[in-house]
Regions:
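Bacterial N-terminal signal peptides
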Residues: 9-18
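Cleaved targeting-peptide boundary
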Residues: 25-31
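N-terminal lobe/hinge region of extracytoplasmic solute-binding protein
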Residues: 34-88, 220
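Extracytoplasmic/periplasmic ligand-capture domains
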Residues: 68-69, 84, 92-94, 98-135, ...
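Non-catalytic accessory/assembly modules
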Residues: 116, 137-160, 164-194, 198, ...
């Protein structure tokens, strides 16, 4: 992976420890930063957006986790007592949970300490299948074919009641600290799903039953932090969980990364988390978020606003004001792809007829990706050729496809060929049946979105296609997209692990309204998706991945636009931070705040 790290101070962040005095015990180490989009809540089975998941990943604990500073994609035990046992046919997985792990105190436990048990993971998994919660991640797990789970869900759909106490053949507690999954089909990469606490964090049944529909506002977990303040869409405060387990850092660092090796040596043997408090603000506009960081109101900048790139990194080098403040800068390829979605159920832009396919492919050809990267991303992105993401299995950096092309002439010829021509004396094209062709674009009310809107409108104007915009905040647009109440909307898709299956679900028919927001449904694609999910990595799987990419490009339910670079910044007193693959918000537990250095720096 192409990665560079700029340390503007001549001393490496980890080396600052030796010169810094120990902070007074009464001083709480606090990490402050801002998110660009508001959270939606904190219930693992109800949330989908990465901003909420970033918070949830620090409150709850999954059995496994991706290892910080290890070779990207390495999985290690978290609450699990060793790695789970996997059968040779990839159908049976047995987890053993460490004893003596406790949930944070909550009135739901009636004053008693509540130990984490295997039953909590079984209950949490079953919640995904409970129709009452309408979980957006249900389809992710339905495809694994856990024996008996689908029957339990279907019974609940008929009766209106989900029976959590009903025994399930494929999901059992073998004893207080052991649970087992049995699948109907092989799943070689099944364990990776249990390395994401925002998906598979354990939730206590008593808490869900106490708070009911209010569970989104009452997260109670076993993770390193707990939520102590929440002002919806404005700010959050999390503090160290006083009941957190004895979590000692030890990892074999990535042998190809000297910086990771140095930090790993410094962290080795330390008890996590290292900080006491995390304060998060929601600042949606780029410039205020950038100025908040420059003014010292935040210690860390999570993804520098790309429209500030010219100011922050002129000619690719840190600006003098950043150098003077000894700010750490890290720029790495983000494991993501940005997409323009088309609702395949929409009567104007959706459908599988040659005319509708031609319309979507023409719009895709009209996108000026170079202009998008220059104007919108400020050169902090590179063109996407397909759904495959850098850093994920199957990504081919040499691949070139129609998706990566820009040709207004070809796009216009395609529209002409399939009957999208002006019929009413204006420049604007009409549908083949003569009705007006208008593309409705969903967007958000912030400055960055307005820049994107101008590019999208310029694309359609060049094709003589009329458009209008539907403006609402991200959570509302997301709800509308899940319900299929939109025509076109753009967003980014990030990978949660090295397996491409989750990303490929963007085109998987049964996931329509969840991962598959375009609502694309094609039997051939669905069959390939299931097959690739059941076989080990190798030539056969790679061929299936290539064929699935080709189908998405041919039918064009979406346009794959770009893979972004992420630029993170931190003041020199933030120690041990690296933007590590698949370890996103989980980094809280690994970073430290050098109170002495911070005090000395702010005095000058």
């Amino acid at each position: 992976m192409n990665r560079f790290r700029i340390l503007l101070c001549p001393l490496l962040a980890v080396a600052l420890a030796g010169s810094a005095p120990v902070a007074h015990a009464a001083e709480r180490k606090t990490l402050r930063y801002a998110l660009e989009i508001a959270e939606t809540g904190f219930d693992p089975v109800e949330i989908y957006d990465i901003y909420s998941r970033d918070i949830v990943a620090n409150i709850f604990d999954a059995p496994l986790r991706f290892a910080y500073l290890a070779a990207p994609g390495t999985v290690e035990p978290s609450t699990a007592d060793g790695m789970p046992e996997m059968s040779s046919d990839y159908k049976t997985f047995t987890f053993h949970i460490k004893q003596g792990i406790y949930f944070t105190d909550d009135p739901a436990f009636q004053g008693k300490r509540r130990e984490l048990t295997a039953a909590d993971y079984v209950y949490s998994y079953k919640r995904i299948f409970d129709p009452h919660w309408n979980s957006p991640i249900y389809e992710n797990f339905e495809t694994f074919g856990v024996l008996g789970m689908q029957s339990l869900r279907e019974a609940a759909l008929k009766s209106g009641h989900f029976d959590y106490d009903q025994p399930v053949e494929g999901l059992k507690t073998l004893d207080r600290y052991t649970f087992q999954f049995r699948l109907s089909t092989p799943s070689p990469r099944f364990l990776q799903n249990f390395a994401d606490a925002s998906l598979m964090g354990a939730v206590a049944r008593e808490v869900v039953e106490k708070y009911g529909e209010g569970i989104m506002a009452h997260p109670v977990g076993t993770g390193p932090f707990r939520l102590v303040e929440w002002h919806r869409s404005s700010s959050m405060v999390l503090e160290r969980n006083p009941d957190y387990r004895n979590d000692i850092f030890h990892v074999t660092p990535d042998p190809s990364d000297p910086g990771a090796q140095e930090i790993a040596r410094e962290l080795d043997g330390k008890r996590l988390p290292l900080i006491d408090r995390v304060e998060i603000s929601i600042i949606e506009e780029s410039q205020p978020r950038w100025l908040s960081f420059l003014n010292g109101e935040a210690d860390f900048l999570d993804v520098m606003p790309r429209d500030m790139a010219d100011l922050a990194l002129p000619n690719g080098k840190p600006a003098p004001n950043l150098v003077r403040k000894h700010i750490q800068v890290e720029r790495v390829p983000q494991i993501d792809v940005t997409v323009a979605l088309y609702n395949m159920d929409n009567p104007v832009i959706g459908g599988y007829s040659p005319q509708r396919v031609a319309l979507r492919r023409a719009i895709n050809l009209g996108f000026d990706t170079a202009e998008i990267i220059r104007t919108y991303y400020k050169f902090q992105a590179f063109p996407a050729q397909a759904i495959s993401m850098p850093g994920v299995y199957g990504y081919d950096p040499k691949l070139r496809t129609e998706n990566g092309l820009t040709s207004v002439a070809r796009a216009k010829a395609l529209l002409d060929q399939y009957g999208y021509v002006p019929r009413h004396g204006t420049r604007w094209r009409d549908n083949p049946d003569g009705s007006p062709l208008v593309i409705e674009i969903s967007t958000e009310p912030d400055q960055r979105s307005r820049i994107w809107d101008e590019i999208y409108q310029k694309t359609l104007d060049a094709l003589d296609i009329h458009c209008r915009f539907k403006v609402a905040k991200f959570p509302d647009q997301f709800k509308a997209a899940r319900a299929g109440s939109y025509m076109s909307w753009s967003l980014g898709e990030s990978a949660t692990g090295p397996d491409p299956s989750d990303t490929l679900r963007m085109g998987y028919g049964p996931a329509a309204g969840a991962d598959n927001l375009s609502r694309f449904k094609l039997a051939a694609y669905d069959e390939m998706y299931l097959k690739q999910n059941q076989i080990p990595d190798g030539p056969e799987r790679l061929q299936l991945l290539r064929q699935m990419n080709a189908l998405l490009i041919a039918y064009a339910p979406m346009k794959f636009i770009a893979h972004r670079y992420v630029i993170d910044m931190a003041y020199p007193w933030v120690r041990y931070y690296r933007h590590w693959p698949f370890v996103r918000a989980d980094f809280w537990r690994y970073v430290d705040i050098d109170q002495g250095l911070k005090a000395r720096t702010l005095r000058h």
